[in-house]
């Protein structure tokens, strides 16, 4: 097979890592693959720069931009349709909302035999404006009518799409987002890193991994941390991430009286995130919008329980009372009590962590994801040939 994976930008992020591993799996299975993206610039850093001999072709075009730009997007559709037609791909696989809309339209215009799309997170939801929701829902309905298969990294988003009348039930297939789990499964606490971050040896650690940006949950995390700090004087809070709201969050911790208990580690490279998570006892994730939080999978791979909100795909990996606890969004008291319970009961903490580790080891290996996609491509192409 000859497959084109298309995403608007290859910054360091979950959807991008998924795309990279999907392409890598194709090449390792003996197929031909091109990864097509727009300019991969951002505070997060470029994933393309981290790729070492990926084994597949990579192409960037300035026409592919993340923001809605009608004139540029129209040019992108026609350019991409012409390119796909010339290259005679068997499959175009688009990722995320913007590339999904542009790529599916272009793929159908070009007559690509199989047009598929992966939902990593929805561009509409209860925390977005009515106008934005209507715009994206209509665009997603239009694009869904121009593709053969829609993959989702969580069942929750399939349900949300069908409720919004996007696509048909038979179009959807859940394929959990595979990851390179080995470094998380094997991670051990590093005393030198702990010392470098200024975390005393006898302190327990609550971790958070997310960009310092609204809706990533820090508006809830820090007030919750203040409650936990009062109950557990030896606890520190390790923040793994950076972003435009850092100064505001640092000020918030000062106002809450916990600035000396919070370590802002800054942007941690994907190659080292396992080392940092290994220093924690529990991970909190209070994002209001997340497809399926990769940080929850990564934390559980290290047997660290997770406390999170039951939004989007989170309950599919954070099983309440089994691999962590789910608490009502915005309920600081419930979140604090869940964290305190995990911190104060080491036997329960170990049990939650080990259950989660077993869960993600089975569901989230990247090779399992890749093999599932390839088998589905082949089955869909075979079914289309019979028609």
Language-model-derived ranges and their functions:
Residues 84, 267-268, 275-280:
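Short alpha-helical donor nucleotide-sugar binding micro-motif in glycosyltransferases
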Residues 146-174, 179-183:
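A short, active-site helix/loop in glycosyltransferases that binds the activated sugar's phosphate group
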Residues 107, 334, 341, 348-363, ...:
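A short, well-ordered alpha-helix in the C-terminal region of glycosyltransferases
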Residues 288:
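Aromatic "clamp/platform" in nucleotide-sugar-dependent glycosyltransferases that forms part
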Residues 320-321, 325-332, 341-346:
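Conserved acidic donor-binding segment of nucleotide-sugar-dependent glycosyltransferases
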